[in-house]
Curated annotation (Swiss-Prot):
The lineage of its organism: Eukaryota, Viridiplantae, Streptophyta, Embryophyta, Tracheophyta. SMART domains: THN. One of its GO terms (biological process) is defense response. PANTHER family: OS03G0233200 PROTEIN (PTHR31048). Gene3D superfamilies: Thaumatin. Keywords: Pathogenesis-related protein, Plant defense, Signal. CDD domains: TLP-P. SUPFAM superfamilies: Osmotin, thaumatin-like protein (SSF49870). Belongs to the thaumatin family. This is Pathogenesis-related protein 1C. Residues 1-20 form the signal peptide.
Amino acid sequence: MSTSAVLFLLLAVFAAGASAATFNIKNNCGSTIWPAGIPVGGGFELGSGQTSSINVPAGTQAGRIWARTGCSFNGGSGSCQTGDCGGQLSCSLSGRPPATLAEFTIGGGSTQDFYDISVIDGFNLAMDFSCSTGDALQCRDPSCPPPQAYQHPNDVATHACSGNNNYQITFCP
C-alpha cells in the first residue's frame, strides 16, 4: 500500500472519531457584550438576552472564548475595556486581561473533548460553561475554586466530555 493511501486511511479513522461541536453563547448580562474566540469564532456583538452560536471543527486545540465589555467599534476597529484583542472586532489573538475564559479542545482524546473555565488571565464576567453530557462549570466571582476554574497554572480543573456534543456558555448567569 502506498504511503499516501496509508496516510489517507489514518486521517479517515481519526476524523471518524471526532466531530465538530456547536457552542451556544448566551448573554444574560444587563448590557451588550462582544464575545470573541480563537482560533475560531472571531468576534461579534451580542445584545442583552441574545444567544448566538459558533461551530468549532473537530481537532481544534487550545480554543478560547471570552466576552469583551465596554467596547466601541467603527468599521471593525475600536477598543474594549476588558478582553480587548488588538482593537479588532474579529479576534485573531487572545484578549488582554482581565478576561474570564472558556477553554476547550475538540476531539483531543480522539473520541473525547476537554473543557474548562480559566481566571488565570483575570475575571471580567461570571460564566457558566457546560457540555451537553458532562459537568456544568460555574464561575461567578474572581475566587471561583478548582475544580470549577483554573486560578493558577497547576490547578486541576479540566473536564472531559464525550465527542459529538454541544456546549453552552452563559455570561452573567
